[in-house]
Amino acid sequence: MPPKKKKLAAIIKLQISAGQANPAPPVGPALGQHGVNIMEFCKAYNAATESQRGDVVPVEISVFEDRSFDFKLKTPPAAKLLLKAAGVQKGSGEPHKTKVGKVSMDQIREIAQTKMVDLNANDLDQASKIIAGTARSMGLTVEG
């Protein structure tokens, strides 16, 4: 007889710096209210994201009724990747008036390649257009 499927109790979505998960907010309260072992998650997440230190890595945590959990790592947010590519700290407060930096089409294509698994696009050109739109709405000029 096949093993019984665990019943899903909740799905928690968080954005945590890679390799730096700890029981302090936002991780602790989000997991604590579902009865998950917080330290166990922190150790597993930090081990899984050790190679991506410095980036913010979104994670989707599936919590089951027996309080066990499973998590899926996503790719870093497009906005963070664009800021890093442009070499600026943050986007513009007035994106369509004040431009804060420039990104080339090659950089956008590279980011689109990275984000392809999480994006709702069929090919690289469509993914590039999505990323270029994000760049424009952050006050970055797209060249090329």
Swiss-Prot record:
Cellular component aspect of the GO annotation: cytosolic large ribosomal subunit
InterPro entries linked to this entry: Ribosomal_uL11, Ribosomal_uL11_bac-typ, Ribosomal_uL11_C, Ribosomal_uL11_C_sf, Ribosomal_uL11_CS, Ribosomal_uL11_N, Ribosomal_uL11_N_sf
PROSITE patterns registered for this protein in UniProt: RIBOSOMAL_L11
Keyword Ribonucleoprotein: yes
GO molecular function terms noted in the UniProt entry: large ribosomal subunit rRNA binding; structural constituent of ribosome
GO BP terms in the entry: translation
Name under which the protein is recorded: Large ribosomal subunit protein uL11
Species of provenance: Saccharopolyspora erythraea (strain ATCC 11635 / DSM 40517 / JCM 4748 / NBRC 13426 / NCIMB 8594 / NRRL 2338)
Gene it is expressed from: rplK
